[in-house]
Amino acid sequence: MPLFSLVLLILGLHCAPPNSCEGKITSCLSPQQNATLYKMSSINADFAFNLYRRFTVEIPDQNIFFSPVSIPAGLAMLSLGACSSTQTQILEGLGFNLTDTPVAEIQQGFQHLICSLNFPKKELELQMGNALFIGKQLKPLEKFLDDVKNLYETEVFSTDFSNVSAAQQEINSHVEKQTKGKIVGLIQDLKPNTITVLVNYLCFKAQWANPFDPSKTEEGSSFLVDKTTTVQVPMMHQMEQYYHLVDTELNCTVLQMDYSKNALALFVLPKEGQMEWVEGAMSSKTLKKWNRLLRKGWVDLFVPKFSISATYDLGDILLKMGIQDAFADNADFSGLTKDNGLKVSNVAHKAMFYIGEKGTEAVPEVRFLNQPETTLLHPIIQFDRSFLLLILEKNTRSILFLGKVVDPTEA
């Protein structure tokens, strides 16, 4: 049976925008004018936290990192070619109620989301891209090709999958080019009967609004991995005004660090022994509550400098979330092609991210202002044990990245 492979790639790095997107995003609607985006962000957030909780079961006590916007976008694009229960399961698995939100509205929502994320922003490089590699022997429907190009700004390539090594090289070369060499050899074991590969990637680069002074980074600070394990990490230090709060209901401290433009990071530090309680309570409503209660004030802040990466095969997890027919022999992708027997073989997701003194990647030198020396009246927030990390795009409130840092020394 011919196989469909879905590869979801996310980078907290600098990437080159795809040529096919040039000239398309200049007419993008302002997110403030489109209520669909806010509805989408809430649904995607709840999907993100549900998926996150699945990860905590599958890989307990380990670093977790993925893109809550990249995965739904890739699956929603896949649903364009799905019909009947195959399509229904994909969209309902993403958290959509098809009675309240028709399929056309969902696809329009993702179109506006991608358009808004790709809209040029000063001092913030953010780009979501899609590439579809279709076997030369497959006869895709024109409507499907038009939809993936117009709704998802997808580049489509006709690929000879009969030559597995050449097809693999073509895909890897495209990914390497789009990520400016950051990802080399993404696909290593392309299956011989693969006939279509969909690649979704999200690239991000930004500078902190208040960069850390590298001279204040302590190289050998202790980070508690568990009750018996401590590792040494570079710990960044800064006295600055941040939005923060103590959530007494969830027993955690929340700190917001702004990027220079249109993005922010939420660091969530549960009290010792309370991580599972916080994880179980995370939802779109929780984010809205924090957004309402965060207050700005001076903080003596300690945050580890680290990189994190993760690779997942999402197949088993998506099956448990109700997306089953797409992987079965009776999968219905008649919206993609009239050829019979196409099914999804695997859904791979790769995520990479780096946090340092200046942001997610090295940027031009900046000047550091003198900070107040007195710390007696300022709260000390020290991320020296397991914490949660969320990166959000401000305009759409979309969660770009979501993760848990258990051991910052494990890249």
Curated annotation (Swiss-Prot):
Glycosylation sites: N34, N97, N163, N251
Domain of life: Eukaryota
One GO MF term: serine-type endopeptidase inhibitor activity
Gene Ontology CC, one term: extracellular space
Cleaved signal peptide residues: 1-15
Residues the entry annotates as binding thyroxine: N291, K394
Gene3D superfamilies: Alpha-1-antitrypsin, domain 1, Antithrombin, subunit I, domain 2, Serpins superfamily
Compartment list: Secreted
Family classification: Belongs to the serpin family.
PANTHER family linked: SERINE PROTEASE INHIBITOR, SERPIN (PTHR11461), THYROXINE-BINDING GLOBULIN (PTHR11461:SF375)
Function of the molecule: Major thyroid hormone transport protein in serum.
Protein name as catalogued: Thyroxine-binding globulin
Organism: Bos taurus (Bovine)
Higher taxonomy: Eukaryota, Metazoa, Chordata, Craniata, Vertebrata
